[in-house]
Amino acid sequence: MRYEKKFIEVNGRRMACVDEGDGDPIVFVHGNATSSYMWRNIMPHMEGLGRLVALDNIGQGDSDKLPDSGPHSYMIKEHQEYFDAALDTLGVRENVTLVMHDWGGTLGLSWASRHPEAIRGFAHCEIVAVNHESYDSYRDGHGERLRQARGLDGPKIVLEDNFFVERVFTGGVMREIDEETMAEIRRPYEEPGEARRPTLSWVRQIPIGGQPANVAEQTTQLAAWARSSGCPKLFIEADPGQIILDDDYAEFDTWPNHAKITVRGLHHPQEDSPDDIGRGLAEWYKGIS
């Protein structure tokens, strides 16, 4: 990775982040089973355009694990507390552009909805945008993988067998993943048990069939905020993608000032089309600056 991570103290824990360059902040927010590493081939396209910030969410990447974690750890509320405090610690407060993937969309949109005056714009890719009706809504077996991870066998297959990294992450990449990349994805979750808890907690919070109810409600509220905000938006569409379904497209059509680029990829197009994403993102950003 060409970027060196630094560490900040947040709520008594160490969080890792990349913080490079000067100017208005461009904040890259990752989701489940990944870290700031996922942006390694996209951020170079943004160099010279602003201050590039990419956090490792708490319990992920090189950020600390939570002490005494268990089934109720790494809930969205807890992740949000660390994310918000990290941005505050880094002095990210105005003219902010968010680049969000997966659950990074929830963390970023929540922050944006509470700091609308601070937002310059946001880009999103494969985020949790709407409540999906059922596991059967998903394509190509992805719903069945989610059903397995969220079922009674979830703790065993995720915490013991590292199912989310070995099966779900890899199932979201089209190319043959090289050993260097897989080693970095596996590294934060090498130890079986609670070290892998973030990957289980995240997947169990995906709103499917209205459950969990609190996440379903938050997802609806954040979509409503995006609908009401005139800030510039960029939809980075992965083709064929994995979690963006007809209901998501219908929702995105209601978001004003919303541009789109399409790149080749499944759930993690950053691994298949990083240069296409980077070039499209840079062109869009220059247009809103």
Task: State the predicted function of each range.
Residues 1-3, 13-15, 53, 60-99, ...:
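Flexible "cap/lid" subdomain of the alpha/beta-hydrolase fold that forms the substrate-access gate
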Residues 13-65, 86, 251:
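Conserved HGGG/HGGXW glycine-rich cap/lid loop of the alpha/beta-hydrolase fold
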Residues 31, 272-273:
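Active-site helix-initiating loop/hinge in glycosyltransferases
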Residues 277:
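Histidine-centered active-site loop/cap adjacent to the catalytic His
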